[in-house]
Amino acid sequence: MYCPRLDHFVRFNPNGTVSRCGHMVNPPQFATLEAMESSEWLVNTKHLMSSGQWPDECVRCQETEPNSIREYAIILDRETAQKDYLQVGGVLDNLCNAACQTCNQNLSSRIGSLTGPGFPIIDNSDQFWLLPQEQIVHLDINGGEPRYSKNYKRLLKNLPPNLKTLRLNTNCSTVLTELVEIANRGIEVTVTVSCDGIGPVHDFVRWPIPWQDFYRNLMTYKTMPVKLNLWTTVSVLNADDLLNIQKFALEHGIDHSYAYLKMPVELSVDNTDSAARDAYIAKQKQLRGIV
């Protein structure tokens, strides 16, 4: 049991540091890729997984085996000829038009704007361009929303020279039409759409993106030369709707994966403090003006 991401993935965090994998829970953060590669933590984590044990940071994949990101990483690694490749992901910036209930201002400028002036604007683009571009074979973009970011627009116009696969995470509030041209250049493009509910559940969790806009744009992506899949972050807000989401994905022939939310703890399905949960939800509704 081993995950190739331990050798090849670099994730940008909102504070400009790097971590190993975007699906890890509370991984250590490092100032540079070089510092992470030479860390005792990485040596110990690789040894642990090579011994058939799950590192604490990898609990999200452990809970969703055999349909975990680890399985996807194994396939991707097997199909990659360049052995010193990098898979780069994480937060390039936090410019986003949505204020999803499970998100925060470090991943969404829309949430920050609701709290008043002085909210953080994240920009890791300089750090990205310092990476060895020729080693970047897989690009895994998420957080904020690519359509609303000038940094992502620049990136899509200046992709690394050896890039083979491109994955973007989107709230599906609009369509990235430029992906057609990129796919036609022979780059495998995957669009991962965050789907945290059907109908009214979606409208609450993914506020303020309307379900009808989400659905229309999702159907447009189905007509494009891209691999399309759905991703669900399961929380107390949508756990009861998970079967409906899975049914929706099956009916439309779209691959679907999910993992359980760990933070904020108030919205975790493992949280037993109902008073804290209800207070958190009420505060978020008030912030967004939801009656």
Where is each model-derived feature located?
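Recognition helices and adjacent regulatory flanks at domain boundaries
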Residues: G52-L86, C96-A98, P117-F119, D123
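Generic structural signal for well-ordered alpha-helices
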Residues: L156, L179-V180, Y215-M219, L242-Q246
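Acidic (Asp/Glu)-rich catalytic clusters
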Residues: E181-E188, K222, L250
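Leucine-rich repeat
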Residues: Q127-Q133, L155-P160, E181-N184
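Accessory C-terminal segments flanking Radical SAM cores
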Residues: M1-I75, K262-V291
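Detector for the c-type heme attachment site
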Residues: Q62-T64, C103-S109
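Core AdoMet radical
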Residues: Y85-L95, N106-D123, E134-S149, P161-T177, ...
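Catalytic cores of alpha/beta
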Residues: V236-H252
